[in-house]
């Protein structure tokens, strides 16, 4: 039975600095996964949300949790030889690439839930473009499993990028730019804090993708996606609390006005009665 230190040592080799980087990477991925699971469950238990927004937020959190767990698993078992190591590394990396595109689609639906009705969403050309783009991206991930389009493995079962890896980055970035066009065009329908939180999913992963071309050891893109999910979750909870507070204040105001109205009616009734008696 391997201890966790022994497991990580086998996975990342004997280089101490590389070990430290990978240990931090795995820890961030696992804790990010835990947070997204908690956020997803929290949204399930919360009932005071718009139905569409709540659905897509739940799916986004769980999809991100799967992404982070798969990436952590791929890191832990990198370099394992044998049947188990062979399959676990391949399945994990496949899910990572596949899930990135699924999350883009879910994010698109989440953005649309803020701006459009379901009927309006179906008629948008850009929405159709995103749907097609995500379908093509998923198809390419499947094809890459047989052609080494995005990545390949050496004899030690270690993952390496292929020349076509840039395609796996270009497709999501294209989709994110389309989503940014929605946020800019329909910004008057959104609060500033909502625009900022939704924009974090676009800006953070793009910045992370640029950095990751030069800093290969940490899963910066996936961590950036996780951070954006944290921002979106905190924002949606804050916005909902603000709306509930406004409703509570309106209810208090309405009750006060009703009480004043009842007192006035009672006073008028008493004055009318006294006038009738005097007559």
Range-by-range predicted roles:
Residues 5, 182-250:
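Interfacial "cap-and-anchor" motif at the non-cytosolic start of specific transmembrane alpha-helices
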Residues 10-18, 78-90, 152-157:
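Membrane-interface interhelical loops and short amphipathic "cap" helices
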Residues 2-6, 28-110, 128-146, 198-213:
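Hydrophobic alpha-helical transmembrane segments of multi-pass membrane proteins
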Residues 13, 17-49, 58, 168-183:
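First transmembrane helix
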Residues 253-279:
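PAS/LOV and related PAS-like sensory modules
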Residues 23-34, 90-101, 160-173, 222-230:
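Alpha-helical transmembrane segments of polytopic membrane proteins
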Residues 106-109, 115-174:
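Membrane-proximal helix-loop-helix units in multi-pass membrane proteins
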Residues 44-58, 112-126, 183-194:
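Membrane-interface helix-boundary motifs at transmembrane edges
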């Amino acid at each position: 039975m391997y201890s966790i230190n022994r497991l990580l040592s086998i996975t990342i080799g004997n280089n101490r600095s590389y070990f430290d980087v990978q240990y931090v990477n795995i820890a961030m991925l696992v804790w990010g996964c835990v947070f997204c699971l908690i956020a997803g469950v929290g949204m399930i238990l919360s009932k005071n949300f718009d139905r569409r927004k709540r659905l897509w937020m739940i799916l986004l959190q769980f999809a991100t949790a799967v992404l982070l767990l798969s990436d952590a698993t791929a890191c832990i078992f990198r370099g394992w030889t044998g049947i188990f190591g062979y399959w676990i590394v391949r399945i994990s990396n496949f899910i990572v690439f596949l899930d990135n595109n699924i999350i883009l689609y879910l994010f698109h639906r989440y953005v649309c839930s803020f701006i459009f009705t379901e009927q309006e969403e179906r008629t948008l050309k850009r929405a159709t473009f995103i749907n097609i783009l995500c379908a093509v991206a998923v198809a390419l991930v499947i094809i890459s499993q047989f052609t080494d389009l995005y990545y390949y493995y050496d004899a030690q079962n270690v993952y390496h990028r292929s020349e076509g890896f840039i395609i796996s980055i270009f497709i999501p970035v294209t989709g994110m730019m389309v989503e940014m066009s929605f946020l800019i065009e329909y910004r008057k329908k959104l609060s500033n804090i909502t625009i900022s939180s939704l924009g974090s999913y676009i800006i953070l992963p793009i910045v992370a993708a640029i950095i990751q071309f030069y800093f290969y050891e940490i899963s910066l893109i996936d961590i950036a996606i996780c951070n954006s999910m944290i921002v979106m979750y905190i924002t949606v909870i804050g916005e909902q609390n603000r709306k509930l507070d406004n409703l509570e204040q309106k209810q208090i105001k309405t009750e006060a006005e009703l009480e004043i109205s009842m007192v006035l009616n009672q006073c008028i009734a008493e004055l009318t009665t006294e006038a009738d008696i005097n007559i």
